[in-house]
Amino acid sequence: MPRDEMEACELGDGEGYQPLRLPRVQGKLEEINPIVAAEVAALERRDRSDADYEKVKMLYVIYLRVHEIYDDQARIRLGVRRKKHLGDLTASRGAGLRSFEALSSMIPLPPETGEFDTGGTSSSVRSASGASGGAASTAASGGSASAAASGASGGSASQSDVSSRSRSQQAPGTKGKKQ
């Protein structure tokens, strides 16, 4: 709208530009949460007048409450993703091997290529598997020879059994590398 047309408009009471109003607060927000009350009490007065200090104090309380409500909603909707919480989790679990094992067990690994993977079953795999064809096919498709041999003695082993055995035989930090 051009400026000339704006000046020609007549505005009634309560219309047009109005200064920003402070929010109306019913009751004392700092009484809801003692942590908020402690943080507001620690607010520095500096060189503010009484009216300015009360205004800043009220806005700080509102900010703290909104931040608290946002954190609650984020935990409910998004799950806990804050850095502080994740740091506390790793500190309580302990860093190192235990957390590595927990993380690596959750990530599915691709089938490992064994020493005997030549496109078909080799004679050493056939001799180790004996009459059990299930263990030989498992070893040829990515399992290890020791897993195939153990599968021959105890019946046929499934693919998940073989891959979990071969993972447990590897040292931590050598995921997918041949030893």
From Swiss-Prot:
* Gene name linked to the record: SCP
Q: Where is this region: Disordered?
A: 107-179
List the protein's name.
Small capsomere-interacting protein
The listed locations are: Virion; Host nucleus
What this chain does, per the record? Participates in the assembly of the infectious particles by decorating the outer surface of the capsid shell and thus forming a layer between the capsid and the tegument. Complexes composed of the major capsid protein and small capsomere-interacting protein/SCP assemble together in the host cytoplasm and are translocated to the nucleus, where they accumulate and participate in capsid assembly.
Q: Name one GO biological process term.
A: viral process
HAMAP family in the cross-refs: HSV_SCP_gammahv
Coarsely, its chief localization is virion
